[in-house]
């Protein structure tokens, strides 16, 4: 049974010792974790401490214990199972887990393996037909209970946009011939079968840009009787920012997207790692930001998210500096796990012993801020905010840069007693101009006034009436250099809404 997401009633909780017995998996990223029916979750491979991994860790759902099974089998080179690897694909059909590709060292892999989880036996499968080239960072999904569809990846020289279908009974690979427009080649994307369509989101593309587009592929099932073809989907709502290395997990009428790696900035580019939950509502066909309570996990990419009944289990990942080994639950508000106290701080147990430093912003840093409304709002919005940023907000009357900008734009200095009129004129200006007319020197004061209005609304309203209806994308930014060109229209739109209410 597929878990049912409850969009306004989900709760984050870091797993503790009462949740599991046995030895939990070592920290890693680029691994896979798949659910085998309702009984177990199987973790395979990954990368940590400059090593590629080939171990298997299994979570027994009923007994709530982690264990390492004794696997046997043989491959073409006499090995008992797949070589160490990361950034491979893993797909489940019945009790079998299928593994393809990945990377080990500087080598891209093209071997194909099956693990029978009833008897814990590996088999290297020799396919025939249109064999896919070795690759990493591909994405794949099961088609019913017999076939696998795989799209894209990176072969070490180029990004890929090919589509392959593997029949797990005959072991025949078929490259799908697609007519019409096709998505740009990519790797690090997600691919999910929804009824008769393969949905592909995001990834890193040719020349390195990170993408945020959504595509649907028809004609992948025999029942379709349709010519295979791609369609780009542009859905309403709170769409995810461009990213790669994210996870997409099915939850009834929803798809749950978590985490990933993107870039930020306008004047200069820098890496960004995400930790928000965004859902694709298949009923209303739109994106929605999932409201969650409690402090979320640190931002990360190349993690795993699996569903266990009505719960989702997050494991591992990487944030540009740290490799995580923590386990987190995302559960409905009525779940017993949701009734626990606040999540404990992220500590060194989340990472390999030779990795130091915290995530982007730790809970311990936030606790030092006491009862600051700014920090409280940031925690409720599920974002990180530096203590410096939380202390930098002043009333608009005391914002000298705001007053000086108004004088510069309108050509005269207002009398000391008319500063309110000066500020109002500037706000009217920002709510009336098109995004392409705004000047570079306006962005800093605009962003600061936008954040000031959000904080003021939070202080004047209860959390429920304020938070559940509003999403503010730029509240967490430290300065305007983190804005991108395509952020400006959205910033002006949100700013106008704040002023109108």
Swiss-Prot record:
> According to its record, what are the GO cellular component terms?
plant-type vacuole; protein storage vacuole; trans-Golgi network
Protein localization: Prevacuolar compartment; Golgi apparatus, trans-Golgi network; Protein storage vacuole
GO terms for biological process? Answer: intracellular protein transport
- Main location as per UniProt: other
Instruction: Respond yes or no to whether keyword Transmembrane helix is given for this record.
Output: no
Keyword Protein transport carried by entry: yes
Tissues expressing the protein = Highly expressed in leaves.
Write out the biased-composition intervals (Polar residues): 351-370
Disruption-associated phenotype? Accumulation of proglutelins in seed endosperm. Mistargeting of dense vesicles (DVs) to the type II protein bodies (PBII) protein storage vacuoles and reduction of PBII size in endosperm. Formation of paramural bodies (PMBs) secretory vesicle-like structures charged with DVs in endosperm.
Q: Name the InterPro entries on file.
A: Kelch-typ_b-propeller (IPR015915), Kelch_1 (IPR006652)
Annotated coiled-coil segments of the chain: none
- The residue spans of each Kelch repeat are 40-86, 96-145, 147-196, 198-247, 254-310, 312-357
Q: Which UniProt keywords apply?
A: Golgi apparatus, Kelch repeat, Protein transport, Repeat, Transport, Vacuole
Region called Disordered, residue ranges:
341-371
Q: What does this protein do?
A: Acts synergistically with RAB5A and VPS9A to regulate dense vesicle-mediated post-Golgi trafficking of major storage proteins in the seed endosperm during grain filling and maturation.
The record's note on quaternary structure and interaction partners says:
Interacts (via C-terminus) with VPS9A.
Q: What is this protein called?
A: Protein GLUTELIN PRECURSOR ACCUMULATION 3
Q: Which organism is it from?
A: Oryza sativa subsp. japonica (Rice)
């Amino acid at each position: 049974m597929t878990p049912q997401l409850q969009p306004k009633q989900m709760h984050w909780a870091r797993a503790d010792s009462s949740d599991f017995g046995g030895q939990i998996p070592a920290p890693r990223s680029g691994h896979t974790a798949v659910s085998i029916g309702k009984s177990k979750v199987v973790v395979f491979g990954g990368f940590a401490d400059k090593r590629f991994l080939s171990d298997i860790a299994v979570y027994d759902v009923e007994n709530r214990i982690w264990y390492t099974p004794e696997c046997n089998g043989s491959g073409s080179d006499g090995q008992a199972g797949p070589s160490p690897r990361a950034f491979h694909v893993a797909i489940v059909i019945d009790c079998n887990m299928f593994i393809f590709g990945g990377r080990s060292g500087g080598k891209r892999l093209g071997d194909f393996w099956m693990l029978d989880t009833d008897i814990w036996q590996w088999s290297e499968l020799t396919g025939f037909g249109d064999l896919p080239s070795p690759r990493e960072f591909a994405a794949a999904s099961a088609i019913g209970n017999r076939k696998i569809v795989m799209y894209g990846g990176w072969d070490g020289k180029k990004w890929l946009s090919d589509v392959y279908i593997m029949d797990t009974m005959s072991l025949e690979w078929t490259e799908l011939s697609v007519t019409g427009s096709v998505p740009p080649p990519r790797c690090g994307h997600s691919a999910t079968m929804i009824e008769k369509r393969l949905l592909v989101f995001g990834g890193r593309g040719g020349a390195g840009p990170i993408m945020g587009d959504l595509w649907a592929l028809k004609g992948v099932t025999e029942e379709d009787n349709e010519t295979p073809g791609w369609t780009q989907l542009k859905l309403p709502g709170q769409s995810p920012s461009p990213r790669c290395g994210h996870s997409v997990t099915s939850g009834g009428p929803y798809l749950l997207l978590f985490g990933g790696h993107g870039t930020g900035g306008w004047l200069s580019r820098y890496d960004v790692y995400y930790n928000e939950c965004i859902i694709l509502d298949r009923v209303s066909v739109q994106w929605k930001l999932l409201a969650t309570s409690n402090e979320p996990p640190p931002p990360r990419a190349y993690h795993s998210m699996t569903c266990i009944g009505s719960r989702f289990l997050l494991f591992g990942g990487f944030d540009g500096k740290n490799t995580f080994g923590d386990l987190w639950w995302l559960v409905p508000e009525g779940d017993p796990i949701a009734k626990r106290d606040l999540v404990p701080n992220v500590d060194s147990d989340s990472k390999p012993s030779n990795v130091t430093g915290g995530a982007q912003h730790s809970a311990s840093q936030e606790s030092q801020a006491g009862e600051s409304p700014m920090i409280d709002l940031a925690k409720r919005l599920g974002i990180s905010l530096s203590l410096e940023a939380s202390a930098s907000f002043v009333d608009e009357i005391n914002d000298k840069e705001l007053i000086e900008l108004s004088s510069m734009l309108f050509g005269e200095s207002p009398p000391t007693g008319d500063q309110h009129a000066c500020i109002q004129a500037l706000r009217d200006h920002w709510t009336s101009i098109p995004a392409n007319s705004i000047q570079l020197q306006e962005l800093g004061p605009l962003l600061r006034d936008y954040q000031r209005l959000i904080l003021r609304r939070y202080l004047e309203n209860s959390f429920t009436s304020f938070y559940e209806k509003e999403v503010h994308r730029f509240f967490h930014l430290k300065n305007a250099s983190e804005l991108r060109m395509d952020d400006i229209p959205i910033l002006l739109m949100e700013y106008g809404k704040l002023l109108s209410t």
